C-alpha cells in the first residue's frame, strides 16, 4: 500500500464528533453519507453526518455522535478501515459541532466571530460572498476542519435509494484495524452473537431450514433500506439482489446464484450489528 505523505496529527481531546479524511473523492455526496451511516451507526446514535460540496473539502467528512463514548469506539475500531478502496484516517474534531454546542449551550454564531477576527480590508469578494452565503471559505492545503465545523445544511441520515451499487466495502469486523490480529475483537466492538441488555435472544439454529440460494433476514432496524443491505452483501461472490417486503422494515430477502454462495454470506454476516441494538439474523429462506 502506498505511503501517504502527511504531517503527524496532533492529539485532540475526546469529542462527540470524529473527523474523517482520505475518503474516496469520486463518491457522490449522498452516497458517501449513506455509506458512512451504514458502517458507523453500530457504535451509537448519530446526530448528523456532514459532507461538504466544496472542492477543497472533498474526501473529508464529520460524523457527529450523541455520546462521546460512541465517537471514541468508532475512532478506535474503524481507524484505517478500507472504505471504497482507501483506508480511512480518523481523529476527533478540534471543536464541538454546532449541534453539540447548542446542546451544551455554548453555541456562538460563526459569522460574528469571523467579522471580529478578520478586518474588512482583508476580505476578498469571494470571501464576502462565502460569509453572506453562510459557508466558510476553505483554506488551501488544509486538512483540518474549519473551526466550529464547516457550515452545511443538515440532511437526513437516511437517503433515498440510489441506482447502482458501491464498490467493494467489507463490513466492520471482517478486516481488523491496524495492530489487531484477524479475529481479535477491537476495543468497543462486540462479538457477533453477544447481546446487549434487552436484545432479542439468539437466532434459531442455522440448520432449521435446508440450504437455499435465498437468505431470509430478520431483526432489521427501521432505517434499513436496499442500498444499505446491498453494501453488506455485494462483496460476496454470486450476489444477485436484495428484496424488501413492502410495509415491513424488519425483514428482507437476499438472493445469490447458488446455495453455497448464500451460505458463505450467511456465515460471515450472521449477527452483524447494523445498529447498536439490532444484530441481524440470517437464515435460509423456506423453499
From Swiss-Prot:
Main location: nucleus
An annotated GO cellular component: spliceosomal complex
Gene3D superfamilies per the UniProt record, alphabetical: 3.30.70.330
N6-acetyllysine sites (modified residues): 66
Residues covered by region (Disordered): 106-134
Modified residues (Omega-N-methylarginine): 157
Pfam families: RRM_1 (PF00076)
Family in the record: Belongs to the RRM U1 A/B'' family.
Assembly: U1 snRNP is composed of the 7 core Sm proteins SNRPB, SNRPD1, SNRPD2, SNRPD3, SNRPE, SNRPF and SNRPG that assemble in a heptameric protein ring on the Sm site of the small nuclear RNA to form the core snRNP, and at least three U1 snRNP-specific proteins SNRNP70/U1-70K, SNRPA/U1-A and SNRPC/U1-C. Interacts with SFPQ; component of a snRNP-free complex with SFPQ. Interacts with IVNS1ABP (via BACK domain); the interaction is indirect.
Protein name per UniProt: U1 small nuclear ribonucleoprotein A
Native organism taxonomy: Eukaryota, Metazoa, Chordata, Craniata, Vertebrata
Amino acid at each position: 500500500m502506498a505511503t501517504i505523505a502527511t504531517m503527524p496529527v496532533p492529539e485532540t481531546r475526546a469529542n462527540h464528533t470524529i473527523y474523517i479524511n482520505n475518503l474516496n473523492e469520486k463518491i457522490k455526496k449522498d452516497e458517501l453519507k449513506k455509506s458512512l451511516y451504514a458502517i458507523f451507526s453500530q457504535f451509537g446514535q448519530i446526530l448528523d453526518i456532514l459532507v461538504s460540496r466544496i472542492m477543497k473539502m472533498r474526501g473529508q467528512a464529520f460524523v457527529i455522535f450523541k455520546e462521546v463514548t460512541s465517537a471514541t469506539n468508532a475512532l478506535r475500531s474503524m481507524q484505517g478501515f478500507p472504505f471504497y478502496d482507501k483506508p480511512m484516517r480518523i481523529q476527533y474534531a478540534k471543536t464541538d459541532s454546532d449541534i453539540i454546542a447548542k446542546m451544551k449551550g455554548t453555541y456562538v454564531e460563526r459569522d460574528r466571530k469571523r467579522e471580529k477576527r478578520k478586518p474588512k480590508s482583508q476580505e476578498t469578494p469571494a470571501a464576502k460572498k462565502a460569509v453572506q452565503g453562510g459557508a466558510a471559505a476553505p483554506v488551501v492545503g488544509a486538512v483540518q476542519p474549519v473551526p466550529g465545523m464547516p457550515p452545511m445544511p443538515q440532511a437526513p441520515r437516511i437517503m433515498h435509494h440510489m441506482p447502482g451499487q458501491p464498490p467493494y466495502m467489507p463490513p466492520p469486523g471482517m478486516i481488523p484495524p491496524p495492530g489487531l490480529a484477524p479475529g481479535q475483537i477491537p476495543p468497543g466492538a462486540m462479538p457477533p452473537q453477544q447481546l446487549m441488555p434487552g436484545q432479542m435472544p439468539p437466532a434459531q439454529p442455522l440448520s432449521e431450514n435446508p440450504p437455499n440460494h435465498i437468505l431470509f433476514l430478520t431483526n432489521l432496524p427501521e432505517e434499513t433500506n436496499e442500498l444499505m443491505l446491498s453494501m453488506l452483501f455485494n462483496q460476496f461472490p454470486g450476489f444477485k439482489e436484495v428484496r424488501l417486503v413492502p410495509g415491513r422494515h424488519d425483514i428482507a430477502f437476499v438472493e445469490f446464484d447458488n446455495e453455497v454462495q448464500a451460505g458463505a454470506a450467511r456465515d460471515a454476516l450472521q449477527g452483524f450489528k447494523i445498529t447498536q441494538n439490532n444484530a441481524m439474523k440470517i437464515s435460509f429462506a423456506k423453499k
